Structure formats: structure tokens, C-alpha cells
């Protein structure tokens, strides 16, 4: 009997390949993230002491008691070690992005220092009660970013604040993307092994999923689109998981809560992905109710808080605030979504506001590699070679399903239906041309290539291998761009400035940071708290209008802040 696109039902040999070890570690990672954010929410909203530490230990002890120490002790320890490693690594360099410094990092620090969004729904009201220099009125009064700190979904901030409470630095919150990438890779191995028939093939597929350009480009930042992608991919894998057990459901439920807590569009994605999950996994009503209650508490701010306050549930994204305004030329903002998606997919990789023009798939023009490493690349944001991989994927899936018998078995129908659904979801967002908003497209391409890899059709298999090789080279180009961006923004213009300040600092000096308001908090916090400089003053200047004058110029920190040193 010939193989179908998805392969036949798993035989005992394949079942043995599907080790539970990767699945358990992935589950432990998701559970640990949920326990940390739930614990920090209990601490923040209800004032309970140290629940972000007590909950993981209590859950671990209960799990080991019921399931046995041999099955879960090592996965739990590995999960803790991976979270610690990701947090330590993330804290070694600065997040130099606008969004990270505008609201992600200030909100994380504020939650760590006692801000409760329920008792002080407007962040600035709480900031006015603080004496620290980074809450100064010169930074926050009239700062339009107050509304994002006050009202944006805060799961990543709760995670970062829990890490800070545990002793990690303020940059450790960016570890969430890395932790979810670990979970995605491990769970991918477990799910894809029976689908592809061989463990090494599953490792290849899991690696392609876990090294998506969006994840790579945002790993060194506090952006949450990469983490959203990982949560979406985990939920998709749960729908494909042949094991109908509790572990797969935990990963799916946890991923749905995480994506809804990362951003408002994540809540929309979660609702749309919950449909196939509920249809395929068929959890009990008791299970649904339990997870719904957990989600309602963890996500109570901002969603329930907004309902109680009479605000639109997704404020400030909804209402009079036009988030996408001026983010691209009108033809991209107002055009047909399928057309704008195609125009971006086959464009030069670029972060310009105007469309950079179309190119032949496979061509790599000047500046595209550098643009691919930027966290929020607008056009062709999945990398310079993704358009070529997309074209090859379309041919591979056509070759794999051209004969009726090769698409008629249940696993293949499930995969094709899910791929079609993901392509449809790509058009749900108002800006499908912006890669960071459409995680479904990349997942659909990878799954289509993996499915074609098991086709009995030689052309389909050959095209699949070619497509995966193109994706691998594309990942290499994106990583090169990420390295350049991170080195320039977080090393040359951050660590180097820190070294100069440390070398020349005297106790009777004053450090002056000149910057727009959106980065004022981060600059003052970094130099006063992290570098422990007693005298730090903030001076507002429009971007690009800074000048040290007669004071010593110590450099341009994260390419946004002029640092001056004044001597008496």
C-alpha cells in the first residue's frame, strides 16, 4: 500500500518513536509560564505574597505525587532551567526598540514595583505617587504612551515582573518568546514524528517552525508578535496531535490564554483557533469551565477591567485611536487584503513606509538582509527568500494532492483543511501585508512542505525538500540581519556607552539624558537603577535635536538617547 501525503495510521514502530519526553518538557514550560503569570496576578491584584514562587512548587509537588517523580521531575527541572537560561540571556543586552521602551519595559517595572491596574486603572495616577526619577512628571505628563501602559494586555509584563521579583533584571521579560520557542520545538518533535515517520524528519520540521523569522527578529526585544506566533503554532500542533490526552489539551488551553494575554489581536486569534481545537479535541464541559475561569482571572486586566470601566474592550486599539494610521502608504492601508498581502509577499524586504516595489521570487537586493533583522519589518517581513519558498510550496502541495486517492485519507484531509483555514485566517487582520500580524501564513507554508515530504509523488517530495532548503537559507539570512541589528542597537550604542560612562564617572558629576518622552523612562531607569548612578537628570528634546553643549558627550545610547556628563 502506498503512503499518503500524511502517511498511514501510526504503526507500533512509529508509536515508539513518539517519546513522551519532549512533550512533557513542552507541557512543563507552558504550565510554568501560566503559574508564574497567575502567581504574579494574585500578588498584584489581591496582594498575596510570593505566589509566583509558591504556585510552581506546589504544582510540581502535586504532579510528582500523582504521576511519579520519574515521569515529571526531570521535565519540571528542565523547564525551570530553560526559563532561567532565557531570562539570564535576555538580560545581557538592551531592548533598543521603540515599543519596548515606550510601554513594555515601563509597565513591567511598574508591576514589579507595586502598580495595581485595578486600583489605579490609569498608570499616570499611580506614577504621580512615586518618588523615583523615572516616574518624573517631565517624562509622563503629556506622554501619549500612558494609555498603552494602562490598557494594553499585560501577560508578558506579568511574566517579566515575576522574573524581576525572583531576582532577574528588567530586561529578562523578553525571555517569554524564547521560552515559547523552546516549547514549540519540543512539542513539534512529538507531534510531527508520527506524521513524518522518522524522528530526524520531525526535528527538521520542528526546527523550521521554531525558527520563524518573526520569532528570530523579536527574540532580543520585548515585542510580543514572536511570542504570539509561537502560541498560535502550539495550538495548531495541538489540533494535529494524534494523542488525545490531557497533555495536548493543556498545551492548547495554555497557548490560547497566552496569546489572548499578549495583545488584543491575540484574543481574536485565540477565539478563531479555539473552534478547530474544540471540534477536534472535544474537551469536557468541566475542563472548558476550569480553563475559562483561569483565563478570566489572568486576563481580567485589561479585558474585564475595561468592561467594568465602560471602555471598549480593546481600548486603545478600538475607538478613535487609529493604530495603523501613517504606518504605510494609503494603498496598503485601504486596499483589498488579498492584494496587499500579495504585494507585500513579493516585495523587496523593507521597513520603509512606502512600498519598496516588487521583485522576482528568490532575488535578494541591497539592504534586504539588514531589513529582515528589524523586529517589525513592514514589507516581505518573513525574509528575502520567503516568496520563493511560498511559490515552491504551492507547487509541492499541488503535486502531492493532484490525485484523488492521495488526498482522501482522514489525516491528509485534516492537514489540508487546517492549512486552508490558516490561509483564510491570514486575511482576518486589517494589515495582512505586515508579517508580524499574520503568523498563520508561515505556519501554513511549513505544514504544507512537511505534508508534501511524505507524499508518494516524487515531484512533491523533491519540491518539498527544495522548499525546506530555501526556508533554511532564508532563516540564515534573517539571523544575519538580526545579529547586525542587535549588535548595532544593543552593543555598539548601548554597552559601549555604558562602558564610557563607567570609565569617566565621578561621584560629584551629574548624568544628563536627553531624549523624547517615549524613551525617557528607560534611559533614567537604566542609568539610575541598573548602573546605580545617584544623580541622573532627564531633559526632554525632540528626536534628533539633542546636544550636550559644554557638557561631556558620552554617546548615543540605544541610538535614541544622548548621554551627557556634567562636572561641577
Cite the ranges covered by each PLM segment:
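Membrane-lumen/periplasm interface segments of specific transmembrane helices
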Residues: 287-373
Amino acid at each position: 500500500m502506498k503512503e499518503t501525503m500524511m502517511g498511514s495510521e501510526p504503526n507500533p514502530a512509529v508509536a515508539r518513536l513518539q517519546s513522551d519526553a519532549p512533550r512533557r518538557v513542552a507541557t512543563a514550560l507552558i504550565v510554568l509560564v501560566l503559574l508564574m503569570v497567575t502567581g504574579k496576578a494574585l500578588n498584584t491584584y489581591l496582594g498575596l505574597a510570593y505566589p509566583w514562587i509558591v504556585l510552581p512548587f506546589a504544582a510540581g509537588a502535586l504532579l510528582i505525587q500523582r504521576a511519579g517523580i520519574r515521569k515529571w521531575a526531570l521535565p519540571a527541572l528542565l523547564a525551570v532551567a530553560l526559563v532561567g537560561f532565557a531570562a539570564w540571556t535576555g538580560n545581557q543586552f538592551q531592548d533598543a526598540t521603540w515599543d519596548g521602551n515606550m510601554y513594555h519595559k515601563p509597565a513591567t517595572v511598574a508591576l514589579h514595583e507595586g502598580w495595581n491596574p485595578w486600583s489605579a486603572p490609569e498608570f499616570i495616577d499611580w506614577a504621580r505617587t512615586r518618588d523615583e526619577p523615572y516616574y518624573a512628571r517631565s517624562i509622563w505628563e503629556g506622554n501619549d504612551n500612558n494609555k498603552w501602559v494602562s490598557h494594553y494586555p499585560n501577560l508578558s509584563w506579568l511574566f517579566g515582573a515575576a522574573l524581576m521579583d525572583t531576582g532577574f533584571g528588567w530586561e529578562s521579560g523578553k525571555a517569554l518568546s524564547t521560552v515559547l520557542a523552546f516549547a514549540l520545538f519540543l512539542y513539534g518533535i512529538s507531534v510531527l514524528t508520527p506524521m513524518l515517520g522518522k524522528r530526524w524528519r520531525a526535528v527538521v520540521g520542528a526546527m523550521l517552525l521554531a525558527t520563524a523569522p518573526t520569532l528570530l527578529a523579536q527574540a532580543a526585544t520585548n515585542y510580543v508578535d514572536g511570542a504570539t506566533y509561537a502560541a498560535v503554532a502550539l495550538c495548531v500542533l495541538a489540533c494535529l496531535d494524534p494523542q488525545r490526552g490531557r497533555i495536548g489539551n493543556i498545551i492548547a488551553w495554555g497557548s490560547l490564554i497566552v496569546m489572548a494575554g499578549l495583545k488584543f489581536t491575540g484574543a481574536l486569534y485565540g477565539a478563531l483557533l479555539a473552534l478547530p481545537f474544540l471540534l477536534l479535541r472535544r474537551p469536557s464541559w468541566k475542563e472548558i469551565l476550569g480553563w475559562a475561569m483561569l483565563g478570566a482571572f489572568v486576563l481580567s486586566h485589561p479585558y474585564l477591567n475595561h468592561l467594568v470601566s465602560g471602555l471598549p474592550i480593546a481600548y486603545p486599539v478600538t475607538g478613535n485611536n487609529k493604530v495603523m494610521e501613517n504606518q504605510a502608504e494609503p494603498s496598503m492601508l485601504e486596499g483589498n487584503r488579498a492584494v496587499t498581502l500579495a504585494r507585500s509577499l513579493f516585495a523587496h524586504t523593507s521597513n520603509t513606509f512606502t512600498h519598496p516595489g516588487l521583485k522576482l521570487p528568490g532575488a535578494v537586493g541591497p539592504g534586504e538582509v539588514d531589513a529582515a533583522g528589524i523586529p517589525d519589518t513592514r514589507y516581505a517581513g518573513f525574509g528575502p527568500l520567503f516568496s520563493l519558498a511560498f511559490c515552491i510550496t504551492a507547487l509541492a502541495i499541488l503535486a502531492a494532492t493532484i490525485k484523488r486517492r492521495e488526498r482522501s485519507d482522514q489525516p491528509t484531509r485534516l492537514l489540508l483543511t487546517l492549512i486552508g483555514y490558516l490561509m483564510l485566517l491570514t486575511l482576518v487582520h486589517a494589515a495582512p501585508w505586515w508579517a508580524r500580524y499574520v503568523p498563520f501564513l508561515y505556519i501554513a507554508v511549513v505544514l504544507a512542505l512537511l505534508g508534501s515530504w511524505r507524499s508518494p509523488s516524487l515531484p512533491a517530495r523533491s519540491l518539498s525538500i527544495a522548499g525546506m532548503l530555501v526556508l533554511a537559507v532564508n532563516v540564515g539570512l534573517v539571523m544575519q540581519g538580526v545579529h547586525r541589528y542587535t549588535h548595532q542597537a544593543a552593543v555598539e550604542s548601548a554597552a559601549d556607552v555604558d562602558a564610557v560612562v563607567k570609565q569617566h564617572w565621578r561621584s560629584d558629576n551629574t548624568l544628563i539624558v536627553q531624549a523624547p518622552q517615549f524613551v525617557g523612562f528607560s534611559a533614567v531607569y537604566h542609568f539610575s537603577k541598573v548602573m546605580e548612578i545617584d544623580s541622573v537628570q532627564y531633559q526632554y528634546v525632540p528626536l534628533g535635536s539633542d546636544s550636550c553643549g559644554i557638557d561631556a558627550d558620552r554617546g548615543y545610547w540605544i541610538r535614541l538617547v544622548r548621554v551627557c556628563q556634567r562636572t561641577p
